[in-house]
Curated annotation (Swiss-Prot):
The keyword Coiled coil applies. Residues 20-70, 497-547, 662-693 are annotated as: Disordered. Residues 674-693 have a biased composition (Polar residues). Residues 14-611 form a coiled coil. The keyword NADP does not apply. GO terms for biological process: Golgi organization. One of its GO terms (cellular component) is cis-Golgi network. Pfam families: GOLGA2L5. Residues 537-547 have a biased composition (Basic and acidic residues). Keywords: Coiled coil. It comes from Homo sapiens (Human). PANTHER family: GOLGIN SUBFAMILY A MEMBER 6A-RELATED, GOLGIN SUBFAMILY A MEMBER-RELATED. This is Golgin subfamily A member 6D. Belongs to the GOLGA6 family.
């Protein structure tokens, strides 16, 4: 490698080096600004690098280069940047102070807002209190209006219920007729079904015989096919052994020919070597060769030709043997393919045989199942007949039970009426004594506190007596109502669910497809008179529930009167003790309101206890209006209410119990109603007067 000559730097290269140096200086300035510490000016290092890299660019005589001026500019820029940094720090501190002032102002504003919010909350609380008082006043007005509307709605509801009950009775009569017709049709169809079942049995027996014959034929054909298959397999095995022997012989011959060929090739190679040696000897300068040598050479040439001919013959034999081997391999392959095809055919035949056997088994199973189903259907028909007979017996027994229950209910009603008369007399006596006492108190408002306390004690004793009587009557009525409910629920369950009972066993899916038998209703119930007597039982339950509700009203109103008297006594005591104190008046008003709420709660609890046992009733006034107008006929234009779905046994019974074909005694109903009782009306009129005073 020759040394390269030194060339001067290009001016473009100089400019690039300067730009690189400027970029490095800027980086160093940034680092200086970040660290804020004085450092060595970047010009010295760059100057050294510049002098090392390009010594020719240095100026002579100690003159300043343009790089020095740039370094000075950079130093000036550093000083100016430090000044700007100081100014920025001062600005930041001033901004922080302003921020603190603003935060202080915000805190003061929040405090003022909180105070305003508290004042607003206090005002809202006062407004809420006023609204609550207003709501209480509205509720009192609403309850009074609601009571008036409630009585009107109940009267309309009763008229609709009566009409609906009549329609329901007609529907039940139609259902009874339909049940009787269905039973007759089923009796007719049962005989037809037995004939059809016998025909099916005969057909199935014939089909089974045909299938058995077909099975025997198929089994014989399968045996023949198996014998043919065995013979053919033996023949194939013999041919395969023959072909294997021939292949073994051909392979042995091929091996011998290959060995002979190798030997001949070895001899030919030796002869060729000897010929090459002789040719080399012949190529040498001619010498006086004896004639014996020439003769030897000729002999060798003849032998070589003879050997070549033999080799060619052996090659032809090898090719022919190879062709024969290929033909044999093709034949063996074809035979293998044929054998595989035959094996596949045999497998398919076996699969078909298995399928036919499975089909035959399935057909036999189907026939057996059909026989079982036919037998089961016959048994079911017999069981259905037995069930119908049992249901007839049950209905007769239930009729006897219902007649006995009617007698018991009449006896219980007579006892209840007697107790009601006694209670009404006691109520009248209590009301008269209370009226006399109230008249005396109103005439002499400045009586002594001892008289007021005695009256208060007497009122409490009366209340206790009334409560005890009420509890006794409630227990008796609840027991009677529970007994009636149980008896009538059992009756309705038997009528609504005729399929259930002692004979109601689990049926299969095939039985569900056949029409279910309807209960055989006795001939006594098909007549109009029998149905009316059958439907009078739920009506008697409705009468009993009306009596219970009347007694509840009779006890609730005197208890409300005693509560009003007690409240009036407390007001008089507070006025006598401190006549001109407004605070005690407010306390008295609060006590009165609390007592009213307690009485309302007690009334609601009594309603919740009594109503579920009596029936799903909506109010106490319904049965009062029904008792006053028991024989009102429904208007023809009144719309019938929609039929209810499968609600339950209690709902069905409630719909039936509203039918009142038997009119109760009008005098008894009016005596039990509080609207026609003069003593109760006087007490009700006096109670608001005492509250106003």
């Amino acid at each position: 490698m020759w040394p390269q000559p030194y060339l001067p730097p290009h001016p473009m290269m100089l400019e690039e080096s300067r730009q690189n140096k400027l970029a490095a200086a800027k980086k160093k300035l940034k680092e200086y600004q970040q660290r804020k510490s004085p450092g060595i000016p970047a010009g010295a290092k760059t100057k050294k690098k510049k002098t090392d890299s390009s010594p020719e660019t240095t100026t002579s005589g100690g003159g300043h280069s343009p790089g020095d001026s740039q370094y000075q500019e950079l130093a000036v820029a550093l000083e100016s940047s430090s000044v700007t940094i100081n100014q920025l720090n001062e600005n930041i501190e001033s901004l922080k102070q302003q921020k603190k002032q603003v935060e202080h102002q915000l805190e003061e504003a929040k405090k003022t807002n909180n105070e305003i919010h508290k004042a607003q909350m206090e005002q809202l609380e006062t407004i809420n209190i006023l609204t609550l008082e207003k709501a209480d006043l509205k509720t009192t007005l609403y309850h009074t209006k609601r009571a008036a509307r409630h009585f009107e709605e109940e009267s309309k509801d009763l008229a609709g219920r009566l009409q609906y009950s009549l329609q329901h009775i007609q529907e039940l009569e139609r259902a009874l007729c339909a049940v009787s017709t269905q039973q007759q049709e089923e009796d007719r169809s049962s005989s037809c079904r037995e004939a059809v079942l016998q025909r099916r049995l005969q057909q199935t027996i014939k089909e089974r015989a045909l299938l058995n014959a077909h099975v025997t034929q198929v089994t014989e054909s399968l045996k023949q096919v198996q014998l043919e298959r065995d013979e053919y397999a033996k023949h194939i095995k013999g041919e395969r052994a023959r072909w294997q022997e021939r292949m073994w012989k051909m392979s042995v011959e091929a091996r011998t020919l290959k060995e002979e060929k190798k030997r001949d090739i070895h001899r030919i190679q030796e002869l060729e070597r000897s010929l090459s040696e002789l040719k080399n000897q012949m190529a040498e300068p001619p010498s006086l060769a004896p004639p014996a040598v020439t003769s030897v050479v000729e002999q060798l040439q003849d032998e070589a030709k003879h050997l070549r001919q033999e080799v060619e013959g052996l090659e032809g034999k090898l090719q022919s043997q190879v062709e024969n081997n290929q033909a044999l391999s093709l034949l063996s392959k074809e035979q293998k393919q044929r054998l595989q095809e035959q094996e596949e055919m045999l497998r398919e035949q076996e699969a078909q045989r298995v399928r036919e056997q499975e089909r035959l088994c399935e057909q036999n199973e189907r026939l057996r199942e059909q026989q079982k189903t036919l037998q089961e259907q016959g048994e079911r028909l017999r069981k259905q007949e037995q069930r119908l007979r049992k249901q007839e017996e049950r209905l007769r027994k239930e009729e006897e039970r219902l007649q006995k229950q009617e007698k018991r209910l009449w006896d219980q009603e007579e006892r209840l009426w007697k107790k009601e008369e006694r209670l009404q007399k006691q109520e009248e006596r209590l009301a008269l004594s209370q009226n006399h006492k109230l008249d005396k108190q109103l005439a002499e408002p400045q009586c002594s506190f001892e008289d007021l306390n005695n009256e208060k004690k007497s009122a409490l004793q009366l209340e206790q007596q009334v409560k005890e009587l009420q509890e006794k009557l409630d227990e008796e009525h609840l027991e009677a109502a529970s007994q009636r409910n149980q008896q009538l629920e059992t009756q309705l369950s038997l009528v609504a669910l005729p399929g259930e009972g002692d004979g109601g066993q689990h049926l299969d899916s095939e039985e569900e497809e056949a029409p279910r038998p309807t209960p055989n209703i006795p001939e006594d119930l098909e007549s109009r008179e029998a149905t009316s007597s059958f439907m009078d039982l739920p009506k008697e339950k409705a009468d009993g529930t009306e009596q219970v509700e009347r007694r509840e009203l009779g006890f609730v109103q005197p208890s409300g009167v005693t509560d009003g008297m007690r409240e009036s006594f407390t007001v008089y005591e507070s006025q006598g003790a401190v006549p001109n104190t407004r605070h005690q008046e407010m306390e008295d008003v609060i006590r009165l309101a609390q007592k009213e709420e307690e009485m309302k709660v007690k009334l609601l609890e009594l309603q919740e206890l009594v109503l579920p046992l009596v029936g799903n009733h909506e109010g106490h006034g319904k049965f009062l209006i029904a008792a006053q107008n028991p024989a009102d006929e429904p208007t023809p234009g009144a719309p019938a209410p929609q039929e209810l779905g499968a609600a339950g046994e209690q709902d069905v019974f409630y719909e039936v119990s509203l039918d009142n074909n038997v009119e109760p005694a009008p005098g008894v109903a009016r005596e039990g109603s509080p609207h026609n009782n003069p003593t109760v009306q006087q007490i009700v009129q006096l109670s608001p007067v005492m509250q106003d005073t």
